[in-house]
């Protein structure tokens, strides 16, 4: 998106019109464009006397209020968009061209109709309303459409006006092979769609990235996290404000998602109005605050969300509860966009979906939100002392790690952390860096990550023979499990960040191979976790796959 915006600025400086170029090229294909400027332009429904026109709304419809229409075979929807050159792009566009962003979604359509396309025709020539073929066209694909219409600007000493006054748009169902309009004899099937035109942004957008990661699951819950949302914050001097309503998550059953992906894979409207099981948009008390009941105790079908620091960045987490065991679900992430005056309730961005599967037993329990080990957000061996009480279980694990950290904290106080740089143990690292590295490491080795899946990268743990005696005594796992070993990178970070006085060292695959692979593993670029990492994930090194 940044590359496109930069190219657009350069382009505007060296050309006076790209209207002709756009006849055969749509530069917005597979792009997520975001040019957020306010405008007061409006749609006007074109009411014609011919019998084939459909009046959707006889009133004016303003920008950022997409058309919602139902269309059948043999009908045409037609619109007129009034162009306002002075209001476009905060004064940049009037010097060159006025851009009109066309975008839309199919919300609902008949099943198995790959032989029919919903096509949009647009032109500055009014005769397109009678003869759509004279205009440019764009077809809804996977439930989504985006196109760009460009009007040159005529400048004078007093003002700048668009060469054209109106953009005319026609929507029609056509045969996908012949591209001919369908006859009214097929009018029994209904298509519902939304369409928007803006001089400042694509109201409907999609992003090829998932932008949400499945952190882990247990038998009846799942934890997902967005990417870094720091750029979405409102910054005020020395603090930032994050809006938890910016992102929402919709969870579908696998079966319903198959149908959704066949026809509406890129349709925000279809996802938000489809047969989803649960959504953070519709869950009561979805936003978790400091005064909220502990989210780990919620068991009904719901999604709770919270802005949090995780893995060295700020993300929004979604905790999904009330799920069935051994079941595959599909999650769709959406994002609101700005209309210039704040977040808009219409339109937005749809990201690529992700899959997750719950576990078959309660051998592992998903915990997060710990006080000391705040970056722990994964499944751990279920404690036989607190079955059904994740809050108590999380506190027990947290207290074990904090107790192990206490002696190290006292030893670190003996280091001259506040001395001049030339007298410190490192001119680059500080005692705070060392303390953080040790905390992450001790949390990872004392709070094992649990899975029920066998892998060459995982270690099988007997319920009575765990990584350390603290787990045997204070946790007593419910059953045998597989441990996802800590990433060796955390040990490397510990050695690098702490004073040599501690004589920390890490096992290696040359002299202590057995010790290495019994205690740690490497991070591999696979579709599942080969090791467990806590802390700033940007410090991780991706190692080549081990084919052995």
Swiss-Prot record:
The chain crosses the membrane at residues 342-358. InterPro entries: MID1/Yam8 (IPR024338). It comes from the Eukaryota. The keyword Lipoprotein does not apply. GO terms for biological process: calcium ion import across plasma membrane; calcium ion transport. One of its GO terms (cellular component) is plasma membrane. Residues 1-20 form the signal peptide. Glycans are attached at residues 32, 70, 112, 125, 159, 175, 228, 238, 265, 282, 285, 291, 324. Changing residue 434 to A: Non-functional. Changing residue 506 to A: Functionally impaired. It is a single-pass type I membrane protein. Changing residue 356 to L/W/Y: Substitution by hydrophobic, large amino acids does not cause lethality nor low Ca(2+) accumulation. It is found in: Cell membrane. Present with 3210 molecules/cell in log phase SD medium. Calcium-permeable, cation-selective stretch-activated channel (SAC) that functions together with CCH1 to mediate calcium entry into cells. Required during mating. Together with CCH1, essential for tolerance to iron stress, which leads to an increased oxidative poise, and to cold stress. Forms an oligomer with a molecular mass of 200 kDa by disulfide bonds. Interacts with CCH1 to form a Ca(2+) influx channel. This is Stretch-activated cation channel MID1. It comes from Saccharomyces cerevisiae (strain ATCC 204508 / S288c). The lineage of its organism: Eukaryota, Fungi, Dikarya, Ascomycota, Saccharomycotina.
């Amino acid at each position: 998106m940044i590359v496109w915006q930069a190219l657009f600025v350069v382009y505007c400086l060296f050309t006076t019109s790209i209207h002709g170029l756009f006849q055969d090229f749509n530069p917005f294909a597979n792009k997520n464009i975001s040019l957020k400027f306010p405008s007061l332009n409006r749609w006007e429904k074109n009411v014609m006397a011919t019998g084939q026109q459909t009046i959707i709304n006889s009133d004016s419809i303003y920008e950022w209020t997409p058309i919602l229409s139902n269309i059948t075979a043999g009908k045409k929807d037609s619109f007129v968009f009034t162009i306002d050159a002075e209001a476009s792009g905060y004064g940049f566009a009037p010097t060159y061209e006025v851009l009109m962003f066309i975008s839309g979604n199919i919300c609902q359509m008949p099943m198995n109709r790959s032989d029919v396309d919903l096509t949009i025709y647009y032109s500055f020539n009014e005769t397109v309303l009678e003869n759509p073929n004279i205009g440019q066209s764009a077809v809804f694909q996977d439930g989504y459409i985006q196109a760009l219409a460009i009007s040159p600007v005529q400048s004078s000493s007093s003002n700048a006006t668009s060469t054209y006054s109106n953009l005319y748009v026609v929507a029609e169902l056509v045969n996908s092979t012949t591209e001919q309009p369908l006859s009214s004899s097929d009018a029994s099937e209904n298509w519902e769609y939304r369409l928007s035109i803006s001089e400042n942004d694509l109201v409907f957008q999609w992003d090829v990235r998932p932008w949400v990661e499945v952190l882990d699951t247990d038998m009846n819950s799942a934890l997902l996290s967005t990417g870094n949302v720091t750029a979405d914050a409102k910054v005020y001097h020395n603090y930032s404000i994050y809006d938890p309503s910016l992102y929402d998550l919709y969870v579908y059953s696998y079966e319903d998602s198959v149908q959704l992906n066949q026809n509406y894979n890129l349709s925000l409207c279809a996802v938000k109005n489809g047969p989803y099981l649960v959504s953070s948009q519709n869950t009561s008390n979805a936003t978790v605050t400091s005064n909220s009941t502990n989210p780990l105790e919620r068991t009904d079908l719901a999604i709770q969300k919270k802005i949090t620091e995780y893995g060295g960045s700020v993300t929004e987490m979604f905790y999904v509860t009330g799920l069935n065991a051994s079941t595959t679900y599909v999650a769709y992430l959406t994002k609101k966009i700005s209309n210039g005056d704040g977040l808009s309730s219409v339109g937005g961005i749809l990201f690529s979906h992700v899959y997750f599967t719950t576990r078959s037993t309660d051998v592992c329990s998903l915990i997060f939100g710990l006080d000391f080990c705040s970056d722990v957000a994964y499944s751990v061996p279920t404690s036989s002392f607190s079955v059904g009480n994740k809050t108590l279980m999380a506190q027990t694990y947290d207290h074990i790690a904090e107790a192990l950290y206490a002696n190290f904290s006292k030893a670190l106080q003996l280091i001259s952390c506040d001395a001049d740089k030339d007298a410190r143990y490192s001119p680059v690292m500080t005692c705070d860096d060392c303390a953080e590295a040790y905390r992450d490491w001790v949390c990872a080795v004392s709070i094992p990550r649990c899975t029920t899946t066998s892998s060459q990268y995982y270690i099988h743990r007997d319920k009575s023979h765990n990584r350390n005696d603290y787990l045997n005594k204070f946790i007593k796992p419910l059953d045998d499990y597989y441990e996802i070993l800590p990433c060796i990178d955390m040990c490397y970070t510990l050695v690098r960040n702490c004073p040599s006085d501690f004589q920390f060292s890490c096992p290696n695959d040359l002299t202590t191979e057995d010790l290495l692979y019994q205690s740690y593993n490497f991070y591999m670029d696979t579709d599942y976790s080969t090791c467990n990492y806590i802390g700033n994930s940007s410090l991780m090194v991706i190692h080549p796959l081990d084919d052995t």
